[in-house]
Amino acid sequence: MNTQQLAKLRSIVPEMRRVRHIHFVGIGGAGMGGIAEVLANEGYQISGSDLAPNPVTQQLTSLGATIFFNHRPENVRDASVVVVSSAISADNPEIVAAHEARIPVIRRAEMLAELMRFRHGIAIAGTHGKTTTTAMVSSIYAEAGLDPTFVNGGLVKAAGVHARLGHSRYLIAEADESDASFLHLQPMVAIVTNIEADHMDTYHGDFENLKQTFINFLHNLPFYGRAVMCVDDPVIRELLPRVGRQTTTYGFSEDADVRVEDYQQIGPQGHFTLLRQGMPDLHVTLNAPGRHNALNAAAAVAVATEEGIDDDAILRALESFQGTGRRFDFLGEFPLEPVNGKAGTAMLVDDYGHHPTEVDATIKAARAGWPDKKLVMLFQPHRYTRTRDLYDDFANVLTQVDALLMLDVYPAGEAPIPGADSRSLCRTIRNRGKIDPILVSDPAQVATMLAPVLTGNDLILVQGAGNVGKIARYLSEIKLKPQIQEEEQHG
């Protein structure tokens, strides 16, 4: 590390100048990789480990990081600190070796908190919408010339990265409640998009515990900070009297401080008016579909308005918003073989949503923008515990599509739970009599099993948080045409 780099480090986090080499266990995850990318650009020596290469590790390698595709004790040699993902178990060889060598082992959010410590932090939390809202806030600040640093849980498509080092005082970050580690953060502004029961193993199955944790997160704001909260959400409305900080509310509700009105969706764009107290109305064209994205935009506008950002910059950023990876991600429209003598096409959309509320929002956006298309969903449930806990909600939401193909549950390290598997979920949906789901036990057969379902005027939603995104990209590569010998590597 040269003198110029050290000077830059001192100007950002003065006491972290003692740190030279930062090692990340699980560096290929979007959240971990984003922080590693910012630190690499700040001049730190970065290394990390994961099980396989991916776009995140490729980007980090291009920045000079050393990536190991294994977990071995020697990987942490000479590290000043080890940053660990919540997905990594305590008996990981690198974690054990770090403890034995008396190297500090910290969670991802603790490192993010250090990045935020000497900046104007804007943290975006909530069960749904965090990634997109983070990208919207970042886009507005960038359009206004404020050059923010951002760390996001998904790819910000306009920038082509999950994270970017800016040169201003602003740091915009997604705040993760899944392991309660967002309590490490001490932002100046916090957005809470909504609060629902998810990741309940972290909260010992106690929803009151989850709600109190969000309150504790908001109490990390200084008394002169601001909480921006969606008043449409019944849990947030219930918690507002307990926040104890300055608040700005947003939503479709008439009592919202920033109110969405006259929403209309035309294809992939939303058109609506934002009413702000004491400010001119904003007539917004948002390049993202769905009422849920109008709410995300309202949150971003509330923050930008409080900062004094020019309305023209806000409107330009939202109209040109390119979205985030795997959030209603349009992968193409492909010609199909003629059906009943008529040629047709199918649109392919990839979406990360894996909670019933998220899936419902995606379906509604698809119906609103393309009402005449047959809606075909390829769904992969994520985690047996989530499938068990939200079983009826999944069954209710998934019956809204015209045709459903379902992959096996993506376990994310969990053991199977009887009755919380895809076969059982398909049976429950079938018994309701609205649609007849197709169980796809072999991912390599997706294109073959999808073909007879298509009519030539279709919108295919590939939905889920596991490896189903790889299948979506594979379907795009082969233009939805079944291959004679479909490769299994995409599954």
From Swiss-Prot:
One of its GO terms (biological process) is peptidoglycan biosynthetic process. One of its GO terms (molecular function) is ATP binding. One of its GO terms (cellular component) is cytoplasm. The keyword Ligase applies. InterPro entries: Mur-like_cat_sf (IPR036565), Mur_ligase_C (IPR004101), Mur_ligase_C_dom_sf (IPR036615), Mur_ligase_cen (IPR013221), Mur_ligase_N (IPR000713), MurCDEF_pg_biosynth (IPR050061), UDP-N-AcMur_Ala_ligase_MurC (IPR005758). It catalyses: UDP-N-acetyl-alpha-D-muramate + L-alanine + ATP = UDP-N-acetyl-alpha-D-muramoyl-L-alanine + ADP + phosphate + H(+). It is an enzyme of class 6 (ligase). Pfam families: Mur_ligase (PF01225), Mur_ligase_C (PF02875), Mur_ligase_M (PF08245). Pathway: Cell wall biogenesis; peptidoglycan biosynthesis. Its EC number is 6.3.2.8. It comes from the Bacteria. Keywords: ATP-binding, Cell cycle, Cell division, Cell shape, Cell wall biogenesis/degradation, Cytoplasm, Ligase, Nucleotide-binding, Peptidoglycan synthesis. Its main location: cytoplasm. It is found in: Cytoplasm. Gene3D superfamilies: Mur ligase, C-terminal domain, Mur-like, catalytic domain, NAD(P)-binding Rossmann-like Domain. HAMAP family: MurC. This is UDP-N-acetylmuramate--L-alanine ligase. It comes from Salmonella paratyphi C (strain RKS4594).
